[in-house]
Amino acid sequence: MADDFAYLNARVRVRRGTLLKESFFQEALDLSFADFLRLLSETVYGGELAGQGLPDVDRAVLRTQAKLVGDLPRLVTGEAREAVRLLLLRNDLHNLQALLRAKATGRPFEEVLLLPGTLREEVWRQAYEAQDPAGMAQVLAVPGHPLARALRAVLRETQDLARVEALLAKRFFEDVAKAAKGLDQPALRDYLALEVDAENLRTAFKLQGSGLAPDAFFLKGGRFVDRVRFARLMEGDYAVLDELSGTPFSGLSGVRDLRALERGLRCVLLKEAKKGVQDPLGVGLVLAYVKEREWEAVRLRLLARRAYFGLPRAQVEEEVVCP
């Protein structure tokens, strides 16, 4: 194993060659479910496609991504491993938040979009099957995951789902920012600063009208969303988004609902992450690849559902295309 990115980036370049082309997604927008399965079987996901149902597609996507992304930290040592681990820990946070929402709404585990992180599917399933969020923290504590400690601390403060998610993100990004500062990886630090901005925008939307104190939820370390803007957006002042012109978030001007915000943030972060291909000697190339695979998983699941339920193209097209 190497302790720098030369070996890892060589492997990542090969794996980027298996990313699905844009033509795949354009074709899939008009296919029946049977034809979608046929098309998917001809890709890198075909090896894990072991059935003809929607859960089989989800399983194939999850397991293929675990193989093509989840093993990246094991291919390197030292600072390189730590940098990659921090990237995948971000997906662990997404997965935990998604499971908390699923448990609260009665959504089945199979419907949860899990992103490739540092934990196996089996661990997330056990966490979902826990009796309550405290039980989920206990499951995550077995492999010594840092989110276990964070979740326990948050649950001592509140049981409200929106607040739990926001406080989890706050604790997570504070810890990750400290770890990233110790690494000589400017591409990673710059990207994580954008993630902090994105999380602040997301949290402000979720907590609008709550009357909660902004300081309890505002994340430090962003580049464009300061505490004042965060507080204003929590109060419903959408002019904050207009003030982000000239930043990577300029496309959010005019957004007024959480779903549109999430879609816009996803595209912004993807675009910024893909700039990492210009960082062949650092973590940037891995960052680009991880986010490209993540976006691929989101698109595949949405397109599978469009085909399975016979939804019109227009209903999902804007969800699977980033300008």
From Swiss-Prot:
Pfam families cross-referenced by the UniProt entry: vATP-synt_AC39
Coiled coil: none
GO cellular component assignments: proton-transporting V-type ATPase, V0 domain
Electron transport as UniProt keyword: no
The keyword Coiled coil is annotated on this UniProt entry: no
Biological process terms in GO annotation: proton motive force-driven plasma membrane ATP synthesis
Entry-linked InterPro entries: ATPase_csu/dsu_sf, ATPase_V0-cplx_csu, ATPase_V0-cplx_csu/dsu, V-ATPase_V0D/AC39_subunit, V-type_ATPase_csu/dsu, V-type_ATPase_csu/dsu_dom_3
GO MF annotation: an example: proton-transporting ATP synthase activity, rotational mechanism
Keywords, sorted A to Z: ATP synthesis, Hydrogen ion transport, Ion transport, Transport
Task of the protein: Produces ATP from ADP in the presence of a proton gradient across the membrane.
Similarity annotation: Belongs to the V-ATPase V0D/AC39 subunit family.
Protein name: V-type ATP synthase subunit C
